[in-house]
Amino acid sequence: MQIVSTSSNQGIASNALGSIFLKLSLIVIAVSLSACSSLSGSFANRSNQLSSGLQNAYSVSPNTANRLSPMIIQSAERYDVSPTLLAALIRQESNYNSAARSPTGAIGLTQIISSHWRQSCPGDLYDENVNINCGAHVLSTYYRSAGSWSKAVAYYNVGPTGYQRSFWTRHKGKKYARSVKHHEKTLKKAL
């Protein structure tokens, strides 16, 4: 005679259904989030989407947004950086002013300090394409060193040595990274 515990079998079935439901829910959420916040389609379509997002999220002029969007996407793809993260970094660094120059000598859209990056970023840093490409290179380099995008963005602001050296500099870098992430979130909502 075999004894079957129906309450035990019901519990197993209930757990299996709950697990399936949870997995399906997570898939639906992930798909809907990526559909809302990512660039898709052909290169021209992604450039147009990003241009529209820059105009709506950051009030970038249509001419500037249309000119810079393809450069941002090309540089982001070349260095395996999210185009929305690179666009948010530009918003934070220069507010899309290609002639920007900081008191410390940082130049252009991504505010590159030429003395630090001269070897790996040759060319005129006031040239928008050169500058965006260099910013993507720097961010990618820091990501490989830091292991996370948040830390890479903090490094972009204070450098890896500054980040490691003191609590206050690390705090400044983390605050900067939160600001860039906020700009990225704003852009993704506008896409």
Question: What is each model feature region?
Answer:
Residues S37-R91:
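Export/targeting segments at the very N-terminus of extracytoplasmic proteins
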Residues P70-I73, E77-N97, I112, I132-A136, ...:
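Short, functionally critical alpha-helical segments immediately adjacent to catalytic or ligand/cofactor-binding
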Residues P103-S120, G135:
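Substrate-binding/active-site groove segments that recognize
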Residues R118-Q119, Y142-A152, G162-R165, K188-A190:
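Substrate-binding/catalytic groove segments of enzymes
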Residues P122-N131:
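A short, structured beta-strand-centered segment in the mid-to-C-terminal lobe
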Residues R170-A190:
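Short, low-complexity, Pro/Ser/Thr/Gly-rich segments in the mature regions of secreted, periplasmic
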